[in-house]
């Protein structure tokens, strides 16, 4: 069963739903949906969905670092990354993990649950305001912890939202990373692999999205950026595995998060 590929939902007000749908229609949603309609999810193993989507979008991944991506075939693992592009980031990381393992989940916006093939791999983040959103996100954190304790892989973008550039020609920088990363490191035995995406969204995105206060409205503009990436090569840098034992020695969620952010952001410098 295929669902609407949209950031709009019934939980939003009617005016906001209208605005989001309008933005998406003029910025690439139809193109993405048409591509997906060519895909028969029932003929493939569920975890291969992500590689198939990457191929549908004709995306290529270029690892620029000397260090290659070394995902262990078993055991708890957290894969973290900066978040410059949006939907593309999640698709690429999930596709890379799926080449080695099928026991993984992504903490991300529920828009990627638009098909049964993807639903089982998504731990949704609720970007709406209010107590219910808080409860939903606490539940996602607990589910992530449980999944790691069972030996699975969690893909996490600790900044939550997509990186923004303060000025048009400056780099896009992640917002402050949340404490979930530190919490998961302290409360599980998961090692961490950092990955850095090289690049940022287009000028129009940063001009437009920076003016929007609503996180959901910002997300609706990602459709255009996803369409722009069709057929492109995405450059990434991979880091060495950070052992869980090293992180537990720090014994502070905030400091663990800061350390892992510094490691991730320095990957291009290390080469």
What does each of the following model-derived ranges do?
Residues 51-56, 115, 226-229:
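Short, conserved catalytic or adaptor-binding loops enriched in Gly and charged residues
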Residues 1-80, 90-92, 101-103, 119:
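Membrane-anchoring hydrophobic helices of lipid-metabolizing enzymes
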Residues 61, 104-106, 154, 192:
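Hydrophobic beta-strand scaffold residues
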Residues 60-69, 108-112, 141-144:
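Short, charged beta->alpha transition segments
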Residues 73-74, 78-134:
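Catalytic core of membrane glycerolipid acyltransferases/transacylases, capturing the structured
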Residues 54-59, 130-135, 170-171:
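Short, flexible loop segments at the rims of nucleotide/cofactor-binding pockets, characterized by
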Residues 2-4, 138-271:
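Non-catalytic C-terminal accessory region of glycerolipid acyltransferases
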Residues 68, 111-113, 129, 199, ...:
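Residue-level detector of flexible, active-site-proximal loop/helix-junction positions
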């Amino acid at each position: 069963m295929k669902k609407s590929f949209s950031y709009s939902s019934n939980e939003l007000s009617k005016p906001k739903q209208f605005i989001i749908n309008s933005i998406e229609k003029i910025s690439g949603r139809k193109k993405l949906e048409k591509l997906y309609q060519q895909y028969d999810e029932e003929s493939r193993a569920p975890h291969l969905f992500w590689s198939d989507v990457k191929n549908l979008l004709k995306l290529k991944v270029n690892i620029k670092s000397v260090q290659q991506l070394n995902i262990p075939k078993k055991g708890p693992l957290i894969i973290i990354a900066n978040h410059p592009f949006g939907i593309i980031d999640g698709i690429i990381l999930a596709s890379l993990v799926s080449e080695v393992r099928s026991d993984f989940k992504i903490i991300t916006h529920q828009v990627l649950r638009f098909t049964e093939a993807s639903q089982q791999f998504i731990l949704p983040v609720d970007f709406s305001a209010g107590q219910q959103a808080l409860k939903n996100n606490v539940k996602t954190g607990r589910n992530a912890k449980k999944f790691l304790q069972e030996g699975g892989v969690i893909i996490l973008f600790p900044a939550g939202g997509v990186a923004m550039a303060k000025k048009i020609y400056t780099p896009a920088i992640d917002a402050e990373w949340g404490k979930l990363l530190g919490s998961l490191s302290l409360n599980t035995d998961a090692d961490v692999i950092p990955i850095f995406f090289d690049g940022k969204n287009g000028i129009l995105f940063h001009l437009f999205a920076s003016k929007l206060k609503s996180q959901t409205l910002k997300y609706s503009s990602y459709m255009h950026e996803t369409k722009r990436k069709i057929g492109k090569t995405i450059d990434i840098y991979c880091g060495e595995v950070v052992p869980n034992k090293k992180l537990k020695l720090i014994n502070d969620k905030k400091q663990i998060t800061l350390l892992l952010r510094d490691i991730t952001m320095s990957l291009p410098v290390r080469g």
